[in-house]
Amino acid sequence: MEIFKEMCPDSEEWKFLREVSLLDIKEDIVYRPYKFLSNGEQTKILLAILFLKENNFLLIDEPTNHLDINARKIIGKYLNRKNGFILVSHDRNLIDSCVNHILSINRRNIEIQKGNFSSWEKNKQQQDELEMLQNEKLKKEITRLEKSARKNAFWSEKLEKSKNRLDVSKTVGFADKGFIGAQAARNMKRSKSIEKRKNKLIEEKSELLHNIDINERIKIHPLQFHNSRLIEFENVSLFYGNNKICENINFVIKQGDRILLKGKNGSGKSSVLKLILGENIKYCGYIYKAKNLKISYVQQNTSNLTGNIFDYINGKQIDKTLFLSILRKMDFSRLQFEKDIASFSEGQKKKILIATSLCEEAHLYIWDEPLNFIDILSRIQIENLILEYSPTLLFVEHDMAFSEKVATKIICL
């Protein structure tokens, strides 16, 4: 409540309580010190305060990074009731649920289009396809005109040379020099006209393809295990101290499965992953883990990344050339390789962890919220990778658009 009074001293308390109720925040949470709230609760409180301010056009920057799937749906429903804001988000479902225009920062320009993300994406794909077809058409026409211009120039030059070699005294009754010269001039004029048309088409072609985002293919190197069953949990309960986090967890991970581990924040998802990885998590129940199973892990936390890219890979047992190549395909410039990773955006740091995992040969890939802060283009790039190579994957992720495309099974905690 103290942050509400600090940021909105002139606003009435009942209005604040109305807004937080729409965001599914219990009233007792409102009266707790702000610093003791979870990241998701803090985000909701700040959103409620933002919309108390009248006559403002609000800027909302990535509000979902610390929210679970259910909380994201609540945020989407809440924002759908509001007007007068710009939302920056990489969550496609959230964008679809609450916006009526898309402001797209393209490679060459900025454009605004009526609709949501899905309609914008469809229009973008159609525009890209149209430009690529037009580009190919122009390329063929330019090649044809080049050949035609060269042919006319060649004949013009040949006629001009033949004119200069003529012996007028021996050519009475045949084409005279004037006729041949005129013919050569016509060919040259035609050649220059064709050249002019060609240059116009080249100029037209140069205006195409500037806003096309080429999603380069990246690869993963999953290993085949000799047995189909890799992991099994049977009636497993997890504890934090003496407090039970979750209970009666039952699932089997078989080779080829892509499993979404789903649950509210604090439901024990990360603890399940860490237990499989062999960390000291208190539990009861039966757990089977195949012997000699190779696991590649992408963690949530990026705060331990330090030094530059070359410092980072020196301590890793991975193909350095492959790692750098993947980063380049994920939109890293070569200049960034020399910079301190601590200065990178959170999305760039997460890409480093994902690129590391993609370089590791493993039977099972475990990814804990891999897409936090990752841009939409890279999310689609990773989706395509997983669908193409079908690694065995256990992951926690709150981006439902990604999860719905990638997951073959869902485990709910």
Predicted regions and their residues:
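ABC ATP-binding cassette signature C-motif
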Residues: 1-135, 225-413
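Coupling and communication elements adjacent to P-loop NTPase active sites across diverse families
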Residues: 9-36, 123-241
